[in-house]
Amino acid sequence: MKKLILIFIIAITSCQNNSGNQPKDLRLIDVEGGVGKSRLVKLSEIAESIEYIPLETNSEAVVGKIFFDRIFYEKGFFYLMEQNRTIIIHDNDGKYFNKINKLGRGPQEYDAAFTVDIDLKTGNISVLASNKIIEYSLDGDFKKVMNYKDNGFLSKHYITRFIKSDLKYFLLSTINDRSQHSGFLIDSTARLLLSVEYPGEDYEKVTTYSALLSIMYPMIFRHKNAVRIKNGLNKYILTINEDNSIDTAYIFNFGKYAPDPLKRDHFRTHAPFIWNKFWNFESDQYLFMTFHTGSLSDKPAKMFRKGGVEGEYDYNFECSVFNKKTGEFQFILQPEINQLGFVEDFEGGPAVWPKYVSSDGYMITYMDAHEFKAHAETHEVSDKFKSIADNLKDTDNPVIVRVKLKN
């Protein structure tokens, strides 16, 4: 009898050990588990180095207001899209290379430019215009046009963004009471390869309560040539494989902090509910995301008011980083007022948060020249940072911040 009991205990223990040794699902982003554990995160924890690269300023290349932070870095070139839809290109060292503005109604021009994307192999620029995508070389030469509205099915949808992946295009569509599709994969002839539907249960809520639209818009981002799709408040981030099939790339666990789309008070500024907002960026090791956290924040961020209005306001969003290799999720505290992101502990610069992540593993953002100079005057910075500031004029072009991320 004693032997039987001993065997039973060993069997139970073995089962428990095996259960505890189950491999961790590295797709799971435990947002709920990150609440109450926010901390300052140093840039050196996720990066190898940082560079500040002033963009050359001359009569041909005066960078105006950048259109919704549309900045890219691929193939050794920086691309900035201005508010007037001019695309200004500088090389790896910040030297002016070219300026492209093909605004017009000709067959090789764009009548509008809603956004752009960069071909990761050639460095060519593709522009999303009305009903078509036009591609130009770095020199500004016309390469080709893809009239996606030639596809009768696509002509019924309003395209807001796109990602060019090799010879394919993923088009992000708005959702409304006439269309439940959040995106389409097409080839270079506008042939439809794949449609991505907005989740049915969420779609019904969005079309019933139009006020939710701005929160529940679908989002796309990329990791190299992989297209990622996030449908509103849905917990899944999808990815499109090379064979045009769809897989789950990541799964959010919002737990008790998941908002109910049918309860409007869940979306008030200080509501204690979490949802993914703004744009996500991804490198080989990290996923960078911003979430509404409302009153859940350990230390709410403070930002300066704009438009000549003095004072501060509570910024009810928190930056975060997810380590794809360890499965660790971390909310990031604000380093100081009016700054968001990682503590810049290499040269003493301001906090760093991506506006782009390149296919070769660089986090990219930028600073206006007058802001760069002001930071050098009010903070303890390295000799290198101060030297760059001393050689800038307030009216110079922006300074690119290029961070080499760890792999």
Q: Which ranges hold each PLM region?
A:
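Bacterial Sec-dependent N-terminal signal peptides
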Residues: 1-32, 93, 124, 407
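Blade/loop signatures of beta-propeller domains
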Residues: 20-56
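Beta-strand-rich domains and repeat architectures in extracellular enzymes and scaffolds
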Residues: 38, 50-85
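Blade-loop segments of beta-propeller domains
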Residues: 57-63, 67, 95-122, 130, ...
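Structural signature of eukaryotic scaffold interfaces centered on beta-propeller domains
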Residues: 67-73, 114-121, 159-166, 209-224, ...
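Short beta-strand elements that form the blades of beta-propeller/WD-repeat-like
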Residues: 76-82, 123-129, 166-177, 218-238, ...
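Asp-box/WD-like beta-propeller blade repeats and closely related beta-sheet repeat scaffolds
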Residues: 129-180, 195-207
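Conserved blade-ending motifs and adjacent loop-strand segments that build the rim/top face
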Residues: 249-271, 325-359
